[in-house]
From Swiss-Prot:
Similarity section: Belongs to the mitochondrial carrier (TC 2.A.29) family.
Protein name: Macronuclear solute carrier homolog CR-MSC
Localization of this protein: Membrane
Keywords (A to Z) from UniProt: Membrane, Repeat, Transmembrane, Transmembrane helix, Transport
Taxonomic superkingdom: Eukaryota
UniProt membrane topology term: Multi-pass membrane protein
Transmembrane stretches, start-end: 22-42, 89-109, 126-146, 184-204, 221-241, 281-301
GO cellular component: membrane
Length: 371
């Protein structure tokens, strides 16, 4: 049985937010979000163009295609910078979102997973994802409102635009409206759906395909694709509602078009998903292609960036399970439990006062006996 000190060591390394995880997660998020931000612009503008229209199709409003919207945004002038609205808001939103999501999920995952050396049960992962994702969505709602409004501002007539110039001004204007947490529930449920659905599905797909393909790149590819597809299906209705609540403006009579998340959902069902007008539930998935593609690219690219980070800037595991070989299967007889990282650390710390690997042991006191 591991000592309490060893358990705490693994908890700090894998289940809790720390400076190293904060820096790595945000750098990776900034890279992947910057590369895929044009797709996010297409997604939210597709959702805005869908409002008030009947729907006939699968994943996009008939007549509005993602690449057509992207071409129109680029042709309007401003170059690629047009897709990022304001760099300070993009940076602030990405850092806040990433930090809140990783911290909240890690906090609840640390509570439910008592043995940090192993992955938690699927139901525990779902619970941690729902709680952590919902809290992260509520906390980051103010900055999301500002950023979403800046992305769709050009769709309005000149006189009706909000014209936020930066993050601080946008937050101040939203605060004056009393709308900092408008749509926070939908935003929380969106992140809860993403965090709770994708991790389990990805692990299940990758683990089961390993028995057919072995250690092959196809495991990561198809596992990510399936997880992102399910994450898109369960989270995008909340994303649509969130967008409507974030960007809505008063009607001529002074009232808001939606009174909350439930009211928004009911009105979309009644006016945009009614089969009497050849419509369907796909109205909630306007911009779905851009949403899926962006989420897939973020997840897939992040895994390679994590690999690069682990290989160059992170101490590797000192112990490894049995390796799988195509010719002979698992090497029960010739298994060497110590990794190359262990051997490098052994050489680097061989002359320390504690002797050998003593300083590298999780307890910091016990020496490892090499036989």
């Amino acid at each position: 049985m591991p000592t309490q000190m060893e358990v705490e060591y693994w908890r700090r390394r894998y289940q809790r937010m720390n400076y190293e995880r904060f820096a790595a997660a945000n750098v990776i998020a900034l890279i992947t979000h910057a590369a895929t931000q044009p797709l996010d612009m297409v997604r939210i503008r597709s959702q805005m163009l869908q409002e008030g229209k009947t729907f006939s199709g699968l994943g996009y409003q008939k007549g509005w295609y993602p690449f057509q919207i992207m071409e129109e945004i680029y042709a309007a002038g401003g170059g690629l910078r047009k897709f990022y609205s304001a760099f300070d808001t993009f940076f602030f939103r990405t850092v806040c979102y990433t930090t809140a999501r990783v911290t909240a999920f890690g906090y609840f995952y640390d509570k439910v997973n008592k043995d940090p050396r192993r992955v938690a049960r699927p139901d525990f992962l779902v619970a941690a994802g729902v709680l952590g994702g919902f809290i992260a969505g509520v906390v980051t709602n103010p900055i999301d409102i500002v950023y979403n409004r800046m992305q769709v501002d050009e769709l309005y007539p000149q006189a009706a635009r909000r014209n936020y110039s930066n993050t601080i001004q946008g937050l101040a204007k939203v605060a004056e409206e009393g709308a900092l947490f408008r749509g926070a529930g939908a935003n929380g449920f969106k992140l809860a759906a993403i965090c709770s659905s994708m991790t389990n599905i990805y692990d299940w797909c990758k683990e089961n395909s390993y028995f057919f393909f072995g250690p092959h790149w196809i495991n990561r590819l198809w596992g990510t694709a399936v997880a992102v597809a399910i994450g898109t299906v369960v989270s995008m209705p909340f994303d649509m509602i969130r967008t409507r609540l974030h960007t809505m403006r008063p009607l001529p009579n002074g009232q808001m078009p939606y009174n909350g998340m439930i009211d928004c959902f009911n009105k979309i069902i009644k006016y945009e998903c009614n089969s009497k007008w050849m419509s369907n539930f796909g109205s909630f998935y306007a911009g779905g292609e851009a949403y899926f593609l962006r989420l897939f690219l973020i997840c897939y690219l992040s895994q390679f960036l994590v690999d690069y980070y682990n290989e160059n800037y992170y101490d590797q595991e000192f112990w490894q399970p049995q390796r799988f070989h195509y010719q002979s299967g698992i090497d029960y007889d010739i298994h060497d439990p110590y990794t190359d990282a262990f051997n490098k650390k052994l050489v680097a710390t061989y002359t320390t006062a504690t002797g050998g690997m003593g300083a590298a042991h999780p307890s910091g006191k016990e020496n490892l006996a090499i036989i």
